[in-house]
A protein has these predicted regions:
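Short hydrophobic/Thr-rich beta-strand motif most characteristic of the beta2 strand and flanking loop
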Residues: 7, 27-34, 42
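Conserved active-site segment of CheY-like receiver
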Residues: 10, 81-86, 98-99
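Two-component/phosphorelay signaling modules centered on CheY-like receiver
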Residues: 12-31
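Conserved phosphotransfer microenvironments
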Residues: 36, 49-72
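Alpha2 helix of the CheY-like receiver
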Residues: 40-43, 106
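A short, hydrophobic beta-strand element within the central beta-sheet of small alpha/beta folds
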Residues: 67, 76-87
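Conserved two-component signaling phosphotransfer/partner-docking surface
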Residues: 101-107
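CheY-like receiver
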Residues: 116-134
Length: 134
């Protein structure tokens, strides 16, 4: 089963998030939210996601507050914070990446969900080699 991540992004809701595209191109399932409140609703509806990718520049609430709200209902949920400066203004999340580095984002995702990511790689290799096809 593919890993599923929630991307909480400050981009315009009608646009396609770059981070979402990066994760989808790596064969992950991606849910999106554009506000803290929307992120909380999504995580309540889909509690078994593998992690959250959080833009630290969300409008409306400081990122530390958003993380606190998310942690209220999902204490151990891995959160990858993303900021343009490369430093974590939210208070020391375990995973932090620069906004403009897709490789860093994918590496953080692999660290969060290594077993499920290895399934994705294995399945992709099977498809490419023709193994397991009908």
């Amino acid at each position: 089963m593919r890993p599923c991540f929630l991307v909480v992004d400050n981009e315009y809701p009608g646009s396609i998030s770059t981070r979402k595209l990066v994760l989808e191109s790596a064969k992950l399932n991606v849910l999106t939210a554009y506000t803290a409140d929307e992120a909380i609703r999504v995580i309540e509806r889909f509690p078994n996601i593998d992690g959250i990718v959080l833009d630290t520049q969300l409008k409306g609430r400081p990122c530390a507050e958003v993380i606190g709200l998310l942690r209220n209902s999902h204490k151990n949920m891995p959160i990858i914070t993303v900021s343009p400066s490369g430093h974590d203004p939210c208070g020391g999340e375990q995973f932090h990446v620069s906004t403009f580095d897709p490789k860093q984002l994918l590496e953080a995702v692999r660290q969060i969900s290594p077993t499920r990511m290895s399934y994705v790689v294995k399945r992709e290799n099977e498809i490419v080699s023709g193994v397991g096809s009908p």
